Amino acid sequence: MAAISMACVSSQCLSISSKLHNLSFSSTQFPNSSLKPLTFSANLSQPLFSQGCSSLGSFQRRGFSVVCEVATLKKADSAAKRTRQAETRRLRNKARKSEVKTRMRKVFEALDALKKKSGASTEELVPIDNLIAEAYSAIDKAVVKGTLHRNTAARRKSRLARNKKVVEIHHGWYTPSLAPTNV
């Protein structure tokens, strides 16, 4: 049985050997004379491609060399960095402006509700005063951060105070003093 299997293995090896022999390359295909064509080794104990080109066989070390290539690293594009910074600033400024608008809107809604309410008392102004204080704080923070111009901030604060004064006059809680006229 072992003899039959050895015969099959040897016949298969011979057929593979003949097929691989047809695959060998001629030296005319490789202009480099150091490359040899690949051939099949008849002896199985030797390496499979004993006459082939091996990169490990011709490796020679000439010495130590240190290569520093700092110049090849590309410096980050400053225009792209400025674009990224502008985008983050835009989002922050947008959030601050939105906060200011939201706080002002809450004050105006509360003042409108109080103006429409009949029989309102002065104690109902306390929560509105707190809302106005929060709006002032948001406006002042936006000015400090550079999101709003100080004149715009002053105009918005004045608008809040004027609307509060209109509600107070409407309910009779405040009577404006007449300015003396000089003749």
UniProtKB/Swiss-Prot annotation:
Belongs to the bacterial ribosomal protein bS20 family. Residues 1-68 form a transit peptide. Residues 79-99 are annotated as: Disordered. This is Small ribosomal subunit protein bS20c. NCBIfam families: S20. GO terms for biological process: translation. Component of the chloroplast ribosome (chloro-ribosome), a dedicated translation machinery responsible for the synthesis of chloroplast genome-encoded proteins, including proteins of the transcription and translation machinery and components of the photosynthetic apparatus. It is found in: Plastid, Chloroplast. Its main location: plastid. InterPro entries: Ribosomal_bS20, Ribosomal_bS20_sf. GO terms for cellular component: chloroplast; small ribosomal subunit. GO terms for molecular function: small ribosomal subunit rRNA binding; structural constituent of ribosome. The gene is RPS20. Keywords: Chloroplast, Plastid, Ribonucleoprotein, Ribosomal protein, RNA-binding, rRNA-binding, Transit peptide. The keyword Ribosomal protein applies. Pfam families: Ribosomal_S20p. Component of the chloroplast small ribosomal subunit (SSU). Mature 70S chloroplast ribosomes of higher plants consist of a small (30S) and a large (50S) subunit. The 30S small subunit contains 1 molecule of ribosomal RNA (16S rRNA) and 24 different proteins. The 50S large subunit contains 3 rRNA molecules (23S, 5S and 4.5S rRNA) and 33 different proteins. It comes from the Eukaryota.
